[in-house]
């Protein structure tokens, strides 16, 4: 039988602090882009408020191409950082336009030589056929992880139908509460997000749930 040992702080020994120590101050501006920061609701997380912050975009793209989302093999963090820095990726839809810049990417060696570049572009093309829940997971909507995305797409079938769903319809889906429903409705009501979704659809990214799609 294992014992649980709880550590307790009995006292603070200020004299033990190293010389020149400084109290940690939660930043009120983003260290990357300089925009104001704010605390996320119901969490201790601090986030940048700028939609154009490179660090936020990189994090968003990393989530989008990750295993639980679009699962684009070989799309490493180093490539993402460089593609964002060079202006090739400004939102997730730009990922599916990279093939239009194939020659430039090879010439600049951003992804590597011809073989590596083509391999990644092929993986991106293949990802277009993913189950729709993977796309929903990758959009980065707060409180909508992989399991929730599966349940949502199984219920609504298409991204278009989901975008029109009311709060009542959303909360009728198992494990989807008011907070999650509000986040989903907020995402789909944003004009910038609507443009990104239109571009994804035009690029041929699957927006429909598979008939056999089930919740694990």
What feature does the model see in each segment?
Residues 1-5:
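Short, small-residue-biased leader/transition segments that mark boundaries at the very start
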